[in-house]
Amino acid sequence: MRLRHERARLSALVALAALVSAGQAVTLRAHGTEARRVVSLTWKRDHITRVLDANRSELGLNGSKAPAQMMTIGGQACLFGDLFAFDVDDRYAFDVDEPVDVTVTYAPDRTQPFAIAWDKNGGDGYGISKEISPEPGATLRKATVRLERARFAGLGILNTDLAVGARGGIALCDISIVRSAATKAAAPRGRVQIEVKDAETGELVPARLGLYDATGRTPLPSDQALLIHRYADETRLLWVAPRLLWPSAERQAFYVNGTYETQVPAGSYEVVATKGPEYRVFKGAVDVKAGQLARVAIPLQRFINQPSRGWYSGDTHLHLMREQTQDVAVWGQVAAEDVHVGNLLEMGNIVTTHYRQPAWGRAGRYLRDGHLIASGQEDPRTTERGHTIHHNLQKPIHLPPEDFFSYHKVFEASHMQGGVSGYAHMAQIFNGRRGLSLDAPFGLVDFIEVLQGGRLGVDNWYPYLNLGFKISPAAGSDYPYFGPSLPGVERYYVKLDGPFDPDAWYSSFKAGHAFVTNGPLLDFTINGRGMGEEIHVARGAQLQIAAAARLNPDIDAMGRLDLIVQGDVAVTERASGGDRIELRKELTADHSMWIAVRATGNREVPAQGQLQELGAIAHSAPIYVVVDDQPFWKTPAVAELVRGEHQILQDLLTAPVDPMGDLEAWETVSVLAPQWERQRYLLRSRVQQADAKYDDILRRATARSSSAQARLGSAGLVVVAAFALAIVRGRDRRRRC
């Protein structure tokens, strides 16, 4: 049954791909691109103007990649699918604040437990009902859910108001909406005028704002708030996810470019403003009287001025389409989060490209007031080999479908253009470790995105450092995915010796002069040399290590600062109060090694291995200590690491294809799977070359350790050599298969 169900879903996806190519999906909107699966359905119901079959609701419920089906059950026209979004007729209810009853008619034998999500006043700005278990015993059943503080202001996907979803599907046969008409009459209005300035310079600055009445409701922003692009949505009001810096229990916010004015009902309001981790949070209040103007001056105080210290932040991963290079709204959103380099990525799959950029190279850069937006690409990207990112390109690089899995060709072309290239989501998903395992030994990978979604994925980074590869850390929000997030929630800082310059910034990042963070700010030197640098010393030389971490107390209190030597915690300093920790240590350089530092906040979050370290966290790029010109391998671990890389490459060649694994499977399903079956066999020679490079590292590491093993006795040497030989012979046998 399960296989038949999967085949049916796959057939439906192929059919949907044909519909999309025929132009029957929801059309794209200005400044956005519809990278979600969204199909408009004809299913008329009272007080409903539009019904969408979608894979996201933007109200807290998500669906799947499979399209909905129409069917007749009990004489009624029913929809079967995972998620449906509904646009409530504005003439019936718009921007209300009252309980609303929603009654759903469903077919129990075709319905899994389901929930209803809605556009809500206060709190997160959306509500999700308790899961409703289908009640068997009849062809059709009804369930009524009361939506508390329903708003219906079009804040869901493509300006919808509520959604019904079930993992595994719901057969939805009717839906009715009944207002309680309890919304209070609007109070007389006054005006509020807000100015946001940098307290040091007195200059107006972009910022993220919140404005909340006594009930937690935020008035819909005026057109002076920045118009934000979220996929193909255009909105001014955004949800601030719990892991994002925000000091209020009310978690809806908007962006302003220094000034903001609007009309609001008379009353008392809470005012909140933030501008990234280098600024203290502002919280204040304003009383608005009917017919009068209330002014609010917000002086944002610096916690620290990183640019004055030579550090400039970036977000490696933003999906924001521009129609022109000088897009003030896109720039404003990035600048409001105080991100100095916002990398706007086209997002390609084997069929098409989303989030198109208007120009490339210097022509694609918009630099204003020290904040830059620039074109880049996330392409190629597949579930089979992972997602790749390429910055600072002079022109986009898109492989044809018949060569789409030859990622190395894009890396090589990027480097020829002066680009900086790496792998995305390495704390997350999409099998990026397979692609990294294949491309790293050829020296193609400049960075990996180790911090994203609140997670630090060192499990996919440390092994390559321990095998002697210099790979820089990067961090990116992947806006509007992951939450949704907001730009700069995870960011990386790059060190410059002079004034901010985009070319120098990308060069310094490629050289590894960087750290990643979602809050803590790092300093780290060895013998006066900084992150990403290489220090050559003689055996026995003394290493003077100095490190420090600071954390804006509005984010969290400082917790600890760890000194990491080849993946192991060598020294820990714990906070004793205040917003700063210092670590000073002297080590003896008895072998080559890489050394880094990691800082965390005080809030304890359960961890599941190194992948799941959540909370405030930062990690530096390594400093590479080279003793007597020897590689900085973690020699005792090399044999096991090489064996692991061989297995990963074997998985790349043999793992079964997941036709629905691609993020936009509705677009790619008819092309990607057959192309992968053809092309992965063409990768065998590339895999064999990578295997040979790993084997060479193993041979050299074994030879290097022979003298040390001899001191342990000849038996120890024989065991190590035999282990290494067994791995190599195993590789040779596999090559002959």
What is each of the regions a protein language model found here?
Residues 714-731:
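A cross-kingdom C-terminal cell-surface attachment/processing module
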